Amino acid sequence: MDVLYSLSKTLKDARDKIVEGTLYSNVSDLIQQFNQMIITMNGNEFQTGGIGNLPTRNWSFDFGLLGTTLLNLDANYVETARNTIDYFVDFVDNVCMDEMVRESQRNGIAPQSESLRKLSGIKFKRINFDNSSEYIENWNLQNRRQRTGFTFHKPNIFPYSASFTLNRSQPAHDNLMGTMWLNAGSEIQVAGFDYSCAINAPANIQQFEHIVQLRRVLTTATITLLPDAERFSFPRVINSADGATTWYFNPVILRPNNVEVEFLLNGQIINTYQARFGTIVARNFDTIRLSFQLMRPLNMTPSVAALFPNAQPFGHHATVGLTLRIESAICESVLADASETMLANVTSVRQEYAIPVGPVFPPGMNWTDLITNYSPSREDNLQRVFTVASIRSMLVK
C-alpha cells in the first residue's frame, strides 16, 4: 500500500511539474526520484482485473530514464516524460480499481489483488517511500493492530432512521402525544408533540427523550445543538404504525424547556449540557441522550389560546424539537464524511464494472446497512478500499 501511494505521489508531482519551459534545476530532484521509480519497475510484469466486468490487463515495464540538461525542459523532453507518466498513471488506476472491488472475511486490511500483493514486495520499497497521507498512516497502524485515528467533518455515523413513537393514542388519531425523529448522516432531529398541549399532564408539562446509540466511539467532537427541529415544523400526513390509516400532523412550534443532552460511554456519563445551545464539545462517547420538555404556556393571548383549546377538537399540535449536528470528530474506524468522496469512488467503480456481491460488503455498498452492522471484517476491508480510493483520487478525479 505504501508503494502504491509513493507511485501515485511521484506521478502526480511529475505530471504537475515536468512541463515545457521549466528549468531542469527546479525539478532535478523530482526527475531523479522519477528515474528511481523507472529503475525499480523495469523488468516487472503485472496483471489486473478479471473480476466482474473489470477487464484483465497485462502490464510490462521497460522504459528509458529521463536525462539531464543544463537548460529548460523542451517539448521533446516533456513528451518522452509524458508517455511514461501516462502509462504509469493508467497502471496505478487499474491497480486501485482491482483492489477496490475485492474483499475478504479474514485479514481484509491486507492487499487482496495479485498486483498490489506483488507491489508489497521488498524490492519495490526503493520507490521514494512516502508515508505522509493520513489514510496510509492509519492503514499501517491498523495493519499492525495499533490504535488509529481519523479526523472527520460531518461524519456519517448515524444510520438512516425516521419514525415515531406514540405515548398517547386513540383509534381516531385525533388526540396524540409522542416523539418523531430523523437520524441520518451526522445529524439528529427530534420533535415531541402533544395535540392537547399538555393540558392534562402533571404541571402542564410533557417530558420527551430520544436516545441514539452510535456504532463506533467518537472522540473530541465539536457539535452544534439547536432548540428547533425544522424538518418537523410543517404539516404532513403520516401513516399509522399498523399501516391501516393515516393521521394529520399540524404543528405549532414552541421553544423546548429544560433541555439536556448527555454523552455516554459504556453507560457512563462523560459530558452533560443543560439549556446550552450553539457549539458544544464531547470528549468521547458511544451514546447520545436528548431530553426536553413541552410546557403549556401559562398566559396566552386570544389568538394563541385559539390554537390550544381546553378540549377537543385539537386542530393544531404543540411541538418542540431539537437538532444535534456533529460538525467534526475523531474516530478509530474509517467513516464516510462530507469532505471526502471515498465511498462514492468505491461504489461507482463496483457498480460500473458489475462486481458481484462478496462476503463482506452489502449490495450496492448501502451505507445504512454497512454502518448498522459494522463488523470487524467490514472495518478492515473498508479501511483498505478507502485508502486505495484516496490514492486513486490523487491521479483520477
Swiss-Prot record:
Family: Belongs to the rotavirus VP6 family.
Cellular component annotations (GO), alphabetically ordered: viral envelope; viral intermediate capsid
Residues noted as binding Zn(2+) in the record, renumbered to the chain: H153
Compartment annotation: Virion
Subunit (UniProt): Homotrimer. Interacts with the inner capsid protein VP2. Interacts with the outer capsid glycoprotein VP7. Interacts with the outer capsid protein VP5*.
Binding site for Ca(2+): N266, D286
GO MF term list: host cell surface receptor binding; metal ion binding; structural molecule activity
Annotated region described as Interaction with the inner capsid protein VP2, given as residue ranges: 62-73
Lineage of origin: Viruses, Riboviria, Orthornavirae, Duplornaviricota, Resentoviricetes
Alphabetized UniProt keyword annotations: Calcium, Capsid protein, Intermediate capsid protein, Metal-binding, Ubl conjugation, Virion, Zinc
Its biological purpose: Intermediate capsid protein that self assembles to form an icosahedral capsid with a T=13 symmetry, which consists of 230 trimers of VP6, with channels at each of its five-fold vertices. This capsid constitutes the middle concentric layer of the viral mature particle. The innermost VP2 capsid and the intermediate VP6 capsid remain intact following cell entry to protect the dsRNA from degradation and to prevent unfavorable antiviral responses in the host cell during all the replication cycle of the virus.
GO biological process, one term: fusion of virus membrane with host plasma membrane
Domain of life: Viruses
Keyword rRNA-binding included in the entry's annotation: no
PTM characteristics: The N-terminus is blocked.
Cross-referenced InterPro entries: Capsid_hemagglutn, Rotavirus_A/C_VP6, Virus_capsid_a-hlx_vir
Further comment: The VP6 trimer contains a zinc ion located at the center of the molecule. The zinc ion is not essential for either trimerization or transcription activity of the DLP. Zinc-depleted VP6 has an increased sensitivity to proteases.
Protein known as: Intermediate capsid protein VP6
